[in-house]
């Protein structure tokens, strides 16, 4: 199956409560606001989603919450990247990918791999 995602997508912020927990009420409001505003797809844990500061469970919780609120209304893109290839593969192998239409994956940025290293990263 080929998915043609085009148009205006928004890399969603992840709202946090005062104590540092995820603000799920704020996330609900944001998700509905973006959908009602007429965008074409949502990007969860993209460039502005604070994924570098969140643990795996928090990332899964945010994704599951947005999937529930979105309810299939728009395509969903999930940001999935980092510098530690082995940790990414291990951490996300049991992730619930149902309802995710595409993955946005950044190349490792801190350790600056060679072209072959980048290829191996995505191959994994």
Question: Model features per residue range: what roles?
Answer:
Residues 2-124:
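Active-site beta->alpha loop and helix N-cap motifs at the rims of alpha/beta catalytic domains
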């Amino acid at each position: 199956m080929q998915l043609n995602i085009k148009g205006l997508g928004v890399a969603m912020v992840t709202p946090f409560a005062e104590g540092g927990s995820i603000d799920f009420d704020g996330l609900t409001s944001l998700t509905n606001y973006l959908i009602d505003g007429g965008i074409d797809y949502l990007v969860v844990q993209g460039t502005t989603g604070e994924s570098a500061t969140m643990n795996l469970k928090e990332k899964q919780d945010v994704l599951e919450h947005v999937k529930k609120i979105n309810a299939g209304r728009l395509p969903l893109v999930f940001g999935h990247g980092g510098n530690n290839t082995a940790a990414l593969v291990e951490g996300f192998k049991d992730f619930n990918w149902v309802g995710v239409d595409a993955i946005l994956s950044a190349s490792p940025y801190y350790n600056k791999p060679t072209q072959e290293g980048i290829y191996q990263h995505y191959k994994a």
